[in-house]
């Protein structure tokens, strides 16, 4: 049978996966460089024509993989499962690890065999006589282990144990390449190891690091008592005895290696509890209403307040989407009203409210994907005559955003620094009247600028007429706008106040169980947001200019967007 390799990504605490609220996920945010590394290693078949790599994976891990991963011609997946399952074009089910290796070795045009997890499968692979190489990504991050976490999946070896194995010449580090994911501020180290002593390393390790020696290795205690064996009495590489003995001895070794050093983060009072209390208040005291687009449970008048110097208020009790929030905000900042611009960037929050059926329903004469003179148009071209989303309005109307920036820079104590999106004369031309309609800004100047050149802090008050509370983006969007303008004007982010008139939850979100899922959860510390540089114009910022550190949300909650 052919030798095989292990490929794994592992964080500082040797964690490879976590389970929260019934969902398994990786213990770090999406890391493009690591995904590209994994794809390159597992799809490269060298010079073999129509070559294929075999992928050995446990059933639970297989269930978490998207179809785009499963159906790649250069990879054939062998799934280890206790149950009988139906094979597919690109995968086969087997019952044991050895059966997986045997089947992989029989594949036509086979290049390499890779074991990709999860934890139990890695454990079997590390103890196997045919293990050849380890491709490990050291993800330089820690996951907050709190009451939300139901299960933590560890790689069987900690980083310190891997280092000791190299020092003792059981493993050899062949190569290491480091990359810094600037946007997440996470260092990645791509490492390749060779197994030097094959199976014998386990016995040698015990001889050197425990009280056992080659004259009295103790076997498992059974009904007939303990039995002692002498290493010199056996030809270990040719007898069946050795493999049974090896299984026992490696269990002892892995008991030594498996000590956990995960970091437990005590729960603290977190600002997101305000949001959770809002949801509870709506559920307990809300009035049921038949509204324009659906039945809601609503309350009138609520306010949230966040100190932006202590964290970026993005939801942690369910996964939010920092890039989508950024792209939608920049779409508005650039005065754009063409939804296809967002769609090309993978953002689809405006699809329903700009569909042909939706526009026809409200007698709007636009092509599909045109929202009319909404958010961004009012922010940058207030008072201009709107034609369609393809027309240029450069130099027309009032640029409220730039006027705000000029006031913040030149007249920071002005009490009229405001962006108003509620233009009554244009409301019937919009696909959707603005849900959030007013940003008001205030500046608190420092007596002396900071060492980094910050002259004060920028505060923001967002006023919103109507809020889909489960979606929850508007707080984060307002915070991000405050961070961007503050950075652009050499200020620190200050206080964000979010005032809502009609705060509501859609009945369909209650009926689907989404709200009950939400209320079972506990929030976490907000991530840190840093903007790496200062651009010439506010329009020029890209998502790669942001660093979002330590964002570890609970799993996403599925909920249909109501148009």
Curated annotation (Swiss-Prot):
Family: In the N-terminal section; belongs to the dihydrofolate reductase family. In the C-terminal section; belongs to the thymidylate synthase family.
Active site residues of this protein: 435
Binding site for NADP(+): 117-124
The protein's Enzyme Commission number: 1.5.1.3, 2.1.1.45
HAMAP family per record: Thymidy_synth_bact
Function in brief: Bifunctional enzyme. Involved in de novo dTMP biosynthesis. Key enzyme in folate metabolism. Catalyzes an essential reaction for de novo glycine and purine synthesis, DNA precursor synthesis, and for the conversion of dUMP to dTMP.
Record's keyword annotation contains NADP: yes
Organism annotation: Acanthamoeba polyphaga mimivirus (APMV)
Pathway: Cofactor biosynthesis; tetrahydrofolate biosynthesis; 5,6,7,8-tetrahydrofolate from 7,8-dihydrofolate: step 1/1
Domain DHFR stretches: 3-195
Catalytic activity of the protein: (6S)-5,6,7,8-tetrahydrofolate + NADP(+) = 7,8-dihydrofolate + NADPH + H(+); dUMP + (6R)-5,10-methylene-5,6,7,8-tetrahydrofolate = 7,8-dihydrofolate + dTMP
UniProt protein name: Bifunctional dihydrofolate reductase-thymidylate synthase
Residues annotated as binding dUMP: 292, 436, 464-468, 474, 504-506
Pfam family, one: Thymidylat_synt
GO biological process, one term: tetrahydrofolate biosynthetic process
Keywords, sorted A to Z: Methyltransferase, Multifunctional enzyme, NADP, Nucleotide biosynthesis, One-carbon metabolism, Oxidoreductase, Transferase
